[in-house]
Each structure stands twice: as structure tokens, then as C-alpha cells.
Curated annotation (Swiss-Prot):
GO biological process terms held by the UniProt record: dolichol-linked oligosaccharide biosynthetic process
Function: Dol-P-Man:Man(5)GlcNAc(2)-PP-Dol alpha-1,3-mannosyltransferase that operates in the biosynthetic pathway of dolichol-linked oligosaccharides, the glycan precursors employed in protein asparagine (N)-glycosylation. The assembly of dolichol-linked oligosaccharides begins on the cytosolic side of the endoplasmic reticulum membrane and finishes in its lumen. The sequential addition of sugars to dolichol pyrophosphate produces dolichol-linked oligosaccharides containing fourteen sugars, including two GlcNAcs, nine mannoses and three glucoses.
Record organism: Aspergillus oryzae (strain ATCC 42149 / RIB 40) (Yellow koji mold)
Entry's family note: Belongs to the glycosyltransferase ALG3 family.
Protein name: Dol-P-Man:Man(5)GlcNAc(2)-PP-Dol alpha-1,3-mannosyltransferase
Record gene name: alg3
Pathway: Protein modification; protein glycosylation
Signal sequence range: none
Length: 413
């Protein structure tokens, strides 16, 4: 009986995460070293990044003329500056081993930040092993050296800062992340909601202006060279994705995947889901319905509220998951954004721990199938749908201050 109580306590009591988390990070550091030692580096975009940076260093500032062996430069300015630093640190990209070590450090730093966010949200210890077990996530960071690792680090730093009400610093970290890869724009609706609830309308607008100004400052060298070319390349929202690389919607068939109607349907679903979350859960801390909230907001009578750390993290990750669910094409590196979000979202959806582990494992399997199949892509969409609709259907509990409870069981505080 005492053993059963000890295991129950160890798995469910959040206070144990203060020693479980550091042990997992240390263990993962050894795992990263083993991966770098035993598994060959995979060349995908690193050489192209370095070729593009070489052109930038040589003086080229026209984004439309910065290209590499696998294509043109399609990421914003902060990506260029980040990889310029890596260019110099890795002997112009030739010392790939050192680059892998740097990305392993980046991975571990991000993991530590993620675990702090989880601890501040009161997450139970049984979730934490899921944060270090992903094969695909390790691959994205230490075997492929994708820029998504840098963007994900900025995203989680921003979430941590938002949890601690460091709004200006949080927006700065987030917009720098957007400047690396615009995938982080998926968090914009959540940031708007939490800042308006916490600060009211005018301070939120100021933060939005700050984010925009930082983007302009980062882009000045390129805006002086070819402003239209920079915006069109770095923030291209109409890019056509190739069906053969898609991880999520392969099962719908190529004709439907490439159709404009499908793209518009996903956009409509994205907007609908965001609106549904706003009306059913995200505005609940204000204590008013949407019309009353908007009326008070526009009249300057809105009362600010103190948001819990768990609420802020859940809203941020839900906004991300909605965007990924409604994205027309996800590539393998996009798993970097989702992997660390999934355990939290499944937990906030009040799923049983066994079910959480099962869905996590299914999702991990699907993202490791290469090339994707109808079955794997169906699982990718299904697992995302479980996370989004699980939180939606349990929004009263998922977006509350208290940890989720399962019937007949209680998380020990």
C-alpha cells in the first residue's frame, strides 16, 4: 500500500518536478551527445543557409538575389543574423560537428525553459518524460540544424515571460522569433487576448506597434535594398507547397490538396475555431460575454484581470495547435513547435494519463513515417484535432486556474 501511495505521489504531485526536471535535462544531454556521436548528420538546408549567408556577407541586400543550392532565401531578417553568427562560429559552415553541438545546447536550453513553463503551470510529473523522448524533435535540432529550433526557443522564452507578466520582454522575444520564421505568427491571436485582458486595449496596441517596429529595425538593410522583394520573400503568405512533402493532408489526395477551395476552407476553419475559443473560453476571465467585453473595451471601461500562468500557457499553445491543425501543409521540421505543446494540451483536455501517452506515441509515430502515407497523415491530423477539440470541449476546466481533475482521482498539490 505504501509503494502504491509513493508511486501515486511521484507521478501526480507537482512538487516532485523540481528534482525530476533537472534529472531529465541531464539525461537528455547524454542522449544528445550519443545521437551526435552515433547517428550521421543529415544534409538538408544547412549548406544552402551558409551559401545564402556568404552572399549577405559579400554585400548582397536584395532578398530576391540571395539564393542557395536548394532555393532562395525565404525567411525573415533575424534568420539571416542568427545563421551569420553560426557561419562565423562553424568556420563558414564547414565545422558541422561544432554546429551540431551548438544546436544540442540550444535544444537543452529550450527544454529547460519548457520545463519551467510546465512547472509554473502546475503540470504533474508524469508529463515530463514526454518532453525528452521525441525522436523527431532531436532530429530537427541536432541532425538537421533547422532554423525552427531557434524560433521554438524564442517561442518558449516568450511564453515564460508572458507567464511572469513581463509583457514587453515577452513581445520582444516573440517578434524576434517571428523574424526567424513566421510560423510564430500563429501565436498572435493568443498574445492579443492575454495582453488585452491583462493590460487593456491601448497598452496592447503599443505592444503590437513595438513588435512591428522591431521587425522593421531587423529588416532595415534589406528594406533599403529592395523593400517589396524583402516582404514578398520573407513573409510570403501565398506560397504553394508541394504535395510530396506534406505530413498532414496527404490523405485528401493531391487534387484537393492543391485546390484553392481547400485552402480557403482551412482558412475559414482557422478563423472559426479562433472565434469559438474566444467566445467560449479565452474571454472567460473578464467575466463578461463578447458584446459586453467589446463595448467596455471600446469605451475604455474594461477592467483588467490577473491571468494565471496555466491560463496563459494553455491559450498560447491552443492558438498554436489551431494554426497547425488548419495549416495546408506541415513539413517534418514543424514538429518542433508541436512536440513540447502536446503533453500540456492533452493534460488540459483532462485525458487519462494512459490516453495521453497513447496519443503522444501515435503522434510521434506519424511524424517519423517518411515519406508520409495516408495513414500517417490521418494520425497527424487526428492527434492535432484531439488536442484542439479536447481543450475546447473541456474549456471550463482547461482554462481554469486549477489543475485538471479526473473523475475519482485528484491531483495532489
Amino acid at each position: 500500500m505504501e509503494l502504491k501511495h509513493f508511486i501515486h505521489e511521484l507521478c501526480l504531485n507537482p512538487r516532485h518536478t523540481k528534482w525530476i526536471a533537472p534529472l531529465l535535462v541531464i539525461g537528455d544531454a547524454f542522449l544528445c551527445a550519443l545521437i551526435i556521436w552515433k547517428i550521421p548528420y543529415t544534409e538538408i538546408d544547412w549548406t544552402t543557409y551558409m551559401q545564402q549567408i556568404a552572399l549577405y556577407i559579400s554585400g548582397e541586400r536584395d532578398y530576391t538575389l540571395i539564393k542557395g543550392s536548394t532555393g532562395p532565401l525565404v525567411y525573415p531578417a533575424a534568420h539571416v543574423y542568427s545563421y551569420m553568427a553560426l557561419y562565423h562560429l562553424t568556420d563558414e559552415g564547414r565545422d558541422i560537428l561544432f554546429g551540431q553541438i551548438l544546436f544540442a545546447v540550444l535544444y537543452l536550453v529550450t527544454l529547460a525553459v519548457v520545463m519551467v513553463c510546465y512547472r509554473q503551470s502546475g503540470a504533474p510529473p508524469y508529463l515530463f518524460p514526454l518532453l525528452v523522448l521525441s525522436k523527431r524533435l532531436h532530429s530537427v535540432f541536432v541532425l538537421r540544424l533547422f532554423n525552427d529550433g531557434l524560433a521554438v526557443c524564442a517561442m518558449w522564452i516568450a511564453i515564460l515571460l508572458f507567464q511572469n507578466k513581463k509583457w514587453t520582454a515577452g513581445v520582444t522575444a516573440w517578434t524576434v522569433g517571428v523574424g526567424i520564421k513566421m510560423t510564430l505568427l500563429l501565436l498572435a491571436p493568443a498574445i492579443a487576448v492575454v495582453t488585452v485582458l491583462s493590460l487593456s486595449l491601448v497598452p496592447s496596441i503599443r505592444l503590437g506597434i513595438l513588435a512591428l517596429l522591431i521587425q522593421v529595425l531587423l529588416a532595415i538593410p534589406f528594406l533599403q535594398g529592395n523593400p517589396i522583394g524583402y516582404v514578398a520573400r520573407a513573409f510570403e503568405l501565398t506560397r504553394q507547397f508541394m504535395f510530396k512533402w506534406t505530413v498532414n493532408w496527404r490523405f485528401v489526395g493531391e487534387d484537393l490538396f492543391l485546390s484553392k477551395q481547400f485552402s480557403l476552407a482551412l482558412l475559414g476553419l482557422h478563423i472559426f475555431l479562433l472565434g469559438l475559443f474566444v467566445t467560449t473560453g479565452w474571454l472567460r476571465p473578464s467575466g463578461s460575454n463578447v458584446p459586453d467585453f467589446l463595448r467596455s473595451l471600446l469605451q475604455g471601461r474594461q477592467r483588467t484581470v490577473v491571468l494565471s500562468k496555466s491560463f496563459i500557457m494553455t491559450v498560447m499553445l491552443t492558438s498554436l495547435a489551431i494554426g497547425l491543425l488548419c495549416a495546408r501543409s506541415l513539413h517534418y521540421q514543424f514538429f518542433a513547435y508541436l512536440s513540447w505543446a502536446t503533453p500540456c494540451l492533452l493534460w488540459r483536455a483532462r485525458l487519462h494519463p494512459i490516453l495521453i501517452y497513447a496519443i503522444w506515441a501515435l503522434q510521434e509515430w506519424a511524424w517519423n513515417v517518411y515519406p508520409s502515407t495516408n495513414a500517417s497523415s490521418s494520425v497527424v491530423v487526428f492527434s492535432l484535432a484531439v488536442q484542439v477539440f479536447g481543450v475546447l470541449l473541456n474549456s471550463r476546466n482547461a482554462l481554469s486556474d486549477a489543475p485538471p481533475r479526473r473523475k475519482g482521482k485528484e491531483h495532489i498539490q
